[in-house]
Amino acid sequence: MEALTELCDIIAKNPKQFSEKLAWICGRCPQTEWLLAESPRVSRSHLNAVLAVARIISKNPESIDNRAKSVVNEFLSAIPASFRRSFWPHSFPSQLISSFYCDFLSYLSCAADLSPEFGTEVARFTGEVVIAAIAPSSGDSDGDPAISKAFLVALSQHFPSILQSDGDKLITMLLDQFVLNRAPASPKEQRQQNSANSETDTSSSQGSPISTNRYPSGKTEMASPGDEVASHGSNLSSKSSSSVVMNGGSIVWKSGVDQLSFGFSEGSGGANPVFRQQVASFEDESIESLEKQEIAFRLITHILDKVKIDSKLQDQVRFIAKRQLQSMSAFLKSRKRDWNEQGQVLKTRVNAKLSVYQAAAKMKIKSLVSLETDGKTSKRLVLETLALLLDAADACLTSVWRKMKACEELFDSLLSGIAKIAVARGGQPLRVLLIRLKPLVLAVCALPDQGAMLESIFKTSCVIIESAWAKDRAPVDNFIMGLASSIRERNDYEEQVDREKQVPAVQLNVIRLLADLNVAVKKPEVADMILPLFIESLEEGDASTPSFLRLQLLDAVSRIATLGFDKSYRETVVLMTRSYLSKLSSVGSVESKTSAPEATTERVETLPAGFLTIASGLMDTKLRSDYRHRLLSLCSDVGLAAESKSGGSGVDFLGPLLPAVAEICSDFDPTMDVEPSLLKLFRNLWFYIALFGLAPPIVKTPTPPLKSTSNSVNSVGSMSATALQAVGGPYMWDNQWALAVQRIAQGTPPLVVSSVKWLEDELELNALHNPGSRRGNGNEKVASTQRLALSTALGGRVDVAAMNTISGVKATYLLAVAFLEIIRFISNGGILNGESSVSASRSAFSCVFEYLKTPNLTPAVSQCLTAIVHRAFETAVSWLEDRISLTGKDARNRELTTYAHACFLIKSMSQRDEHVRDISVNLLTQLRDKFPQVLWHSSCLDSLLFSVHDNTPSTVVNDPAWTAAVRSLYQKVVREWIIISLSYAPCTSQGLLQDKLCKANTWQRAQTTTDVVSLLSEIKIGTGKNELWSGIRTANIPAVMAAAAAASGANLKVSEAFNLEVLGTGVVSATVKCNHAGEIAGMRRLYNSIGGFQSGSTPSGFGGGLQRLISGAFSQAPQPEDDSFNEMLIARFVRLLQQFVNTAEKGGEVEKSQFRETCSQATALLLSNLGGESKTNVEGFSQLLRLLCWCPAYISTPDAMETGIFIWTWLVSAAPQLVSLVLAELVDAWIWTIDTKRGLFASDVRYSGPAAKLRPHLSPGEPEDPPESDPVDQIVAHRLWLGFLIDRFEVVRHNSAEQLLLLGRMLQRSTDLEWCFTRHPAAAGTFFSLMLLGLKFCSCQTQGNMQKFRSGLQLLEDRIYRTSLGWFAHQPEWYDVNIPNFCHSEALSVSVFVHFLSNELSESSQSDSKGKPRESGNLIDVTDQYHPVWGEMDNYTLGKEKRKQLLLMLCQHEADRLDVWAQPISSKDSPYSRLKISSEKWTEYAKTAFSVDPRIALSVASRFPANASVKSEVTQLVQTNIVDLRTIPEALPYFVTPKNVEENSVLLQQLPHWAACSITQALEFLTPAYKGHPRVMAYVLRVLESYPPERVTFFMPQLVQSLRYDDGRLVEGYLLRATQRSDIFAHILIWHLQGEDVQETPKDGSIDKNAAFQEILPQVRQHIIDGFSPNALDMFTREFDFFDKVTSISGVLFPLPKEERRAGIRRELEKIEMQGDDLYLPTAPNKLVRGIRVDSGIPLQSAAKVPIMITFNVIDRDGDHSDVKPQACIFKVGDDCRQDVLALQVISLLRDIFQAAGLNLYLFPYGVLPTGAERGIIEVVPNTRSRSQMGETTDGGLYEIFQQDYGPVGSTTFETARENFLISSAGYAVASLLLQPKDRHNGNLLFDDVGRLVHIDFGFILETSPGGNMRFESAHFKLSHEMTQLLDPSGVMKSKTWHQFVSLCVKGYLAARRQMDGIISTVQMMLESGLPCFSRGDPIGNLRKRFHPEMSEREAAHFMIHVCTDAYNKWTTAGYDLIQYLQQGIEK
């Protein structure tokens, strides 16, 4: 319901905006037809909805639509139905029904009061509803009286509008049903009624109106109304039989109520039979009847207030009320013993009856409103009513029920009514009332326990006095004087000895009442009447001697003095001061020893309290100043007088005055000019405070032992101990005094009396001592004591011996200074009294430094004063550190205090005295190091940059030396300040600097701007080594530096030599910001001028308006006419930003410059309105701010994020008040990216980079569609964003726990136990930067402001460690991003994390070695428990250390890997490249990793493949916990081994449950080593079947070879099933089966196996064909026939002469017809054949057959079918193509690996397919020519050819071609290294039309080479001289292009090494194929060796560099080209 209530209030504020919400709520209300049903029943939701609508209307009835109002009115009209229980929901309690009625009617009545129109609508239904409640219809038997009563009770509290015509009817019914519906009246009662009616000249419409009480007929006879009041005037002035004794006399007055003919008096009630009958009649009334009467009276009162009723009916109401009031006195005079009922029953009855009387009194008062003011009858009725009310009030005072709350409320109502009548009528009623009121007041004051009655009397008196003061002053004066004179009347107890104790309570209460009246009415005339009487009593009367009366009068006069009336104030202060000094003068006298206790109370409590009361109440500035002077003078007099007294009189008399002094000094500004006389009084006060030890201790350390005192003088010894205790504690006096001293310190000016001669003369200081005092100047031991105390107070900074030249009084004086200046900082951190804002001028250092400025100080004194400054600073730091855990307003005050001190110290650096400047710099440096947040506070930076000019005293401007010294000092400090701030938070620092540049520019002060520019021009920030800072500074984190570049606004991309010039970018960005601010200001002016608004709202000038905007606040609020301008621009910017978001979500590209401009303008608009008070567009600005924070996150591109960081920095720099809002929105947006899986949190597999792209060939898992956009862009955006957040963390970590908690929320959500990060390798740096932020955040647990979150931070730290380890749960990958210096930044990011982690570990080990554990709480030393992060654990502390060590090792390795990737050709070795780790440590690492996550252990083994210890331990762990690893395919090699297969291990039983692995891994299990184990085979086939057949087709040669070992025909079964799923798979398989039909020369032992293999091939082929469906068979027939015909052309051409062969090809091609449009190229199934170019046939040269090249017209199967392209193919007959297929398979895998790693390397694995025995189809590489062909047309080498083809060296086309040649050469270099292709003559090297190299013809690979394997080509790849000319223009391997080539080779080789097993498995499966490449040596073993798995990444990089160097222009390469030229004529 609370949420619904909040929603209602929001809707009520803006019903138009939330009209849909309102309509929805109205729809939840019960509908009209429902309410009109015969027996409606509502639900709880109905009732809540009705209340909600009613509440909304009550808030804003004029703006709510009619639908809502009609809903409420319809429900109101249906309320009669609610009187039935069936109307309400089931089990709906009565309390809730009452609550509903009350809430509903309160909303309804409120709305009706606010809107007369709505009230009229409500009034139409109110009468009928009330009538139904009063008198339910006789036919409604289901009605529940309790419900209707609950409604009437609620109605009596909240009565809505009614119609005029309903008034009489309702009152008549109420009287009939609830008041007059009784037994018939007796004849006597009838006569009484008639008599009353005749007396008032009225006649009742009722039959027989009777008393409001239910009297049985004939039981009670009452006097007629005519007899009750004989004369109203005489009644009001007559005497009462009762009397109140007052000071020996009596005040006698008679109440009219006593004239009622009850016939009893005080004390005789129980014996009088008439009274007993009266009580009996009261008891006869039921409680229900009383409740009904109360309801009726209250309702009638409401009706009388709403409408005008019939006069006769009104008379009847008045009569009924009168009879109630008449009976009230009798009721109140009853005693408990008169009642038969007792206990709770009686209490309930009395409460009910009193409530009836209260309602009747209010009804009586309301009934008088309609009377004519001047009518005779009216006056008589008014007097009569006053008499009745006063009589009733008097009866309340004497009633035994007086203490009951109901009686007190009745008394209050009576007096309120009396006051209301008297004030309204005035004249005689007022005068008569004041006569009667005085005895009533005295009677109340005479009561021993007045309770609330005295408060009621006080309120009534105030109302009457204030209202009658101007109308009729005389009776008011008489009333006041009568009360005041009553306190002077002598009492009757003179004969008693101890008369002071017998002061009547009435006197004390009257005094208090009169004082309260004075304070309340605030009239000097009243004070002048009363105060003289009080003072006279105090000086001459009974109160002149100690007594309770005197104490009360002193309190009263002090309260009167607070009113600030000059005369009364001065008289009072003089009296109290004289009284206080008189007490001091009597100390030690005989009289003081026998004085009354009240005398002590007066001195200790009353007078000090009075002084404090005056100090608190005085408001007039002049009087406060006078009172301050008087109080300080009193303290000085008291101190001097008490100093000569024995004992502790100084403490006793000065101490009680301190709270008053503190209060009167609370508003005194100590920095203003103070008169010397007042300053001396302050000095005297502190002198005595120090002397008497009244100040709180200022030293926390134990006081040193006393050495200089002697036992020979006891008093001196005691005094020395007291002095030392005063310094070191404990405090011996009242704690309130200590607090008062602290407050006094805040308002005390520096105790520097003279600017010329600082220390006062000895005589003047000695005058503070009494000449005869034991503390006189001549007592050297006393002086020694004071010096010792001073030394202690200074913390031992000044030795006692160095103070010998300081006299005793000077030591006391310096001790007073020390107390004062240190206490300033103890109390509130050193903020002085003054203006509300905390600024440098309010820093207490402004006082401390005053002592240092005085010339001619002696060395000893100067040393002491300097020590005081340092002690004050230490105290300030301690105060700030103690409050570091505060939050909210307290934290804000603490920060403002820090900044105020920093600003003052900055400004003090311009002081003329060098000593002061040095101290300022020293303290400022300490403060900055302790509280780094000052670095980024705007006021501190303002002071730094501009104070050197602002604070230059005009008198010394002409001193060049001083000016130069100060400027030099400022420049040094500013430079250091800015460099440090940039090193921690470069974003925020730059934002602030840009802000200050704008500010300096607007000031138009050339010197200021020049100095700032000269300072900034020398400062640069950048990544890498920086001489400005070292260690782990935030600026060393690449993400932060990238964000800093964005924040600078320079739009820079991080480059290798990234170096951000602070000045240049700052000026540019400041100019941009100023321009945007100017645009907004200009638009505003133009808009206002066009709109005809007042010109006064226009800013006075561009510069001034701009300055206000940049500083973040306007000096004056925007005028209302600006609201429409703001609304228009807000709507525009919101619309534009939403459009950008929509564009991004639809996949469109957001235009960078437009987005940046829009965001900047929106930010300028937002900032321009910050200082305004207008709340019109708050929601709009909130929405705009939210969009500015969220848009970059939505768009998620680096450009958008750069813009975001720029504007966020602008916002937080120019508007610190928005920082929390901005950060909260950014954290929400960050969490949104987690929920929506974006960027860094794109945890879906398809965003994981290489792992996803290599599926399923080299990585396990189903292949998925690639992401729509490059995930790296979003990762880079997150990286920039994270840099900004780290920057903000550094700024807020020390001063804002709230913002830290926001970051903590972000980190907690980011480190959920369920992995939510992307696996993309390009995210490594960003990921570890986030983890670094997390660890930095957790290190805050040692900070005071995060102590209470310590346990939570420890858990978060564990989550961060687990998340960090989670990064290593997958195999390491590489990724190359086409962003300058990105890889270097990634490596550096991990290195910084490693650095932080290693430092944390070293700190941990150091603390452990010292026996001081770093952690506390219940999270350490836990054994055998479940940890929320780590799960089951044995020992938390030990396990945590092991996990940290593991993480550090893995991160070191990752940093090394990334460093190699970033700097592949670097010759340096990483410090982590060769970790010296023992085998035991490796084993422990493996165990720890496995305990966290088994995948981490597998990753460790993968990262260190040559480490036997790790492999052995991981193997054991996998096999031991194998059941838990079923989802991890990478674990397969650790239990599916040839050994386990041989032993048929039980571990293999897990394979049916194991997750699918990659295809290459599955292929490995098909090799003979695994012996075709059934479980292994079943797993392999399940894996293959889990992938689409099209994906498996790539490995068709390997699958065909696996048939050799397929004894169980399992592979064959898979192949047949796959052919059913894919026709293309079937066709490719058939072609490969046909290609294997090769007659090999049998070798020993192999003939049987090969024969069996050859035998099965045609069988499988036939089974496939037999399994074809008709359509599939048709497709198969057409496809194969078509290409068989093309292939057969070669046989036709063979007999023909060469010159006729081309024509023959054309003839044969013309014979071939296309059979369908679904034929495809066998080498590229995705290309559909659309025809043959018959004139394209070319016969090729060949020794045996006639290969032909034919060009087809093809289209892309999945592309545009109208886009027909040529594709040439070579059809070979007589050549075995299978070896080319294998080589190109490896090249294809390498290409995929390179692409997955983002490497810019080029390979072209053209298509080759064997279609039969020694037959095949080979795709022609398009747009290429061989190097030999190029040589046939050009004489020069490649370098010259490239210039001819692509233009001169240096041209764009040439360099592009060179780049293409480079990337292709590097790609084939890696492929050549692995495959070892030979016969690399220029005929086998192709170049395409853009300069790329392509290798063809792989007849010699692996271990084979031409010339009988002579291995003449010894280089790993061909890099001839002409190739080096292109790759290395320098010729000495020093050029940039050569380094690029080598770098790409290294990266390609490193990427290939990651997939070594997959490549080797692919080749190994072909081992038995009979291919020539396997004919000699150990091809598989040597292939593995070329990967060098035993090498680290850096070693592998060095190896590849060596390979490149070795191949560089190797002579064997040139020699082979020469041989080929000589033998084959191939151009070299």
Curated annotation (Swiss-Prot):
Record GO biological process: phosphatidylinositol phosphate biosynthetic process; pollen development; protein phosphorylation; regulation of shoot system development; root development
UniProt KW keywords: Cytoplasm, Kinase, Membrane, Transferase
PROSITE patterns, sorted: PI3_4_KINASE_1, PI3_4_KINASE_3, PIK_HELICAL
Kindly state the tissue distribution recorded for this protein: Present in leaves and inflorescences.
PIK helical domain ranges (all copies): 1483-1659
Task: Please give the residue ranges the record annotates as the region Catalytic loop.
Answer: 1876-1884
Pfam families named among the record's database cross-references: PI3_PI4_kinase, PI3Ka, PI4K_N
Please give the InterPro entries that the UniProt record associates with this protein: ARM-type_fold, Kinase-like_dom_sf, PI3/4_kinase_cat_dom, PI3/4_kinase_cat_sf, PI3/4_kinase_CS, PI3K_accessory_dom, PI3K_accessory_sf, PI4K_N
Q: Which Gene3D superfamilies match?
A: Phosphatidylinositol 3-/4-kinase, catalytic domain, Phosphatidylinositol 3-kinase Catalytic Subunit, Chain A, domain 4, Phosphatidylinositol 3-kinase, accessory domain (PIK)
The UniProt function text for this chain reads:
Acts on phosphatidylinositol (PtdIns) in the first committed step in the production of the second messenger inositol-1,4,5,-trisphosphate. Can bind to phosphatidylinositol 4-monophosphate (PI-4-P or PtdIns4P), phosphatidylinositol 4,5-bisphosphate (PI-4,5-P2 or PtdIns4,5P2), and phosphatidic acid (PtdOH), but not to 3-phosphoinositides. May function upstream of the cold response phosphoinositide-dependent phospholipase C (PI-PLC) pathway.
The protein depicted here goes by the name Phosphatidylinositol 4-kinase alpha 1
